[in-house]
Amino acid sequence: MGLVFNNSTIVAPQAKGIIDPNTSKLIGANDQFFQDMNAELSDKGFLVTSVDSLITWARTGSLMWMSFGLACCAVEMMQCSMPHYDNERFGYAPRASPRQSDVMVVAGTLTNKMAPALRKVYDQMPEPRYVISMGSCANGGGYYHYSYSVVRGCDRIVPVDIYVPGCPPTAEALLYGILLLQKKIRRTGSIER
């Protein structure tokens, strides 16, 4: 790997990516952002960017999440952190405190009694903050939609950025939602609320 010297011209080697073992393709092969970045890196050997783009790039690679597991969807959320899926390879690491987290994953049935606690935890998170609503119960009440004590979707309490459908959604679905959130952050930059 290293530089190649051809007639006193320094040429950077072709940029190589990480191959996804499931698809045998480069990770990000279908993503225009990664294609453009790899082309620029292999062409020039360095990247030129703005400070805003650099901060946005750093945010997508270091999302610290906080679990708000309320029911059975939390089991799938825990499975997503296990070695089989290893969501930390995408820079998605758990934190115990809302003051240290960027993302809140609401997984499960949100009751009227729990709604003020959800809002309080959301308000304690620093800006920019993002919310992933995981599962039918968090998205719209689920099986308990018509119950007097259930909030019909956590988006009535906090603004939601990504909805992950399913009852319960699989760990792959949550991982896909995380990747969509990273793409949304890259596309929009900092979200001002």
From Swiss-Prot:
Which EC number(s) does UniProt give? 7.1.1.-
Q: Which reaction does it catalyse?
A: a quinone + NADH + 5 H(+)(in) = a quinol + NAD(+) + 4 H(+)(out)
Q: Which cofactor does it need?
A: [4Fe-4S] cluster
Keywords from UniProt, A to Z, are: 4Fe-4S, Cell inner membrane, Cell membrane, Iron, Iron-sulfur, Membrane, Metal-binding, NAD, Quinone, Translocase, Transport, Ubiquinone
Q: Name one GO molecular function term.
A: NADH dehydrogenase (ubiquinone) activity
The record's InterPro entries line, in alphabetical order, gives: NADH_UbQ_OxRdtase-like_20kDa, NADH_UQ_OxRdtase_20Kd_su
Q: Does the keyword ATP-binding apply?
A: no
Give the family from UniProt.
Belongs to the complex I 20 kDa subunit family.
Q: Which named protein is this? A: NADH-quinone oxidoreductase subunit B
Query: Where does this protein come from, organism-wise?
Result: Bartonella bacilliformis (strain ATCC 35685 / KC583 / Herrer 020/F12,63)
**Gene, per the UniProt record:** nuoB
